[in-house]
Each structure stands twice: as structure tokens, then as C-alpha cells.
Amino acid sequence: RQDSVANGLKEVRNSYVFIHDAARPYLKKESLADLKDALQHEDACLLMIPSIDTVKLVENGYVVRTPRRDDVFRAQTPQCFKTSLIRSCHEQAALDRRQATDDAQLVEWYSDVPVRVVTGDEANIKITIPADLK
């Protein structure tokens, strides 16, 4: 996935880019408008929804910490960036041979630019298993 995005970014000529997963077909136009609004003042933003489940951090099969639920969100796409910023982050990750779980993580690793949270939508699910289609 990361290589595909990096290759796509080579062709982008716009100042800002929206990076979206094809596995999330239920994106609402209101979410796109909210992201576009955020880009008026930010160079990086993404859709996120609060976690409704308790999350545990685990090492070697043992729970080491339980973050406060208020601090845990689930990332969605699209994730939006100033094109030069995300392109630079992808280039650095390729040089370092690091794989991120999403594009926003690259911005966390390779810049000081804050990533703005934009409230997502529960309907914007990622379809990964057959049960997701029900």
C-alpha cells in the first residue's frame, strides 16, 4: 500500500492531496467537505472516530497498559496533506525502509507538522472480511 501511494504521489500536481482506501466505499460527501475545510488552516488532517471499545497495549502476550478510552480513536480515510509534505515523508520512509500503518504516521515520524483530527463517520467502514458486507 505504501509503495502504491508513493508512486501515485509522483504524479500529483495539486498543492493538496486526499489519500483514500478503495476498501472504504461508504464515504459521505459531508466528510469530504469537513476535510476540505480543515485544509484551509492545516497541512495534514484525517478522519477519525472515537473508540467504543477498551484498547489494551500488549507485549509478549501480557497487558502492559490500558489507555484512557477518551484518548483512543480509530483512523479512517481519506487522509489529506499538503502534497509536498506527504511526498517528502514517503521519500524519507523509503530511504529508511520503514513501513507505516497509514500516511498520517509518516507525517508523525518525519515532520513536526501536527495532524488535525476531523470527526469521521461510523458508516465509513473498511471492508476487509466477508462479514463486513452484511
Regions found by a protein language model. Name each.
Residues 33-34, 63, 95, 116:
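Residues in and immediately flanking transmembrane alpha helices
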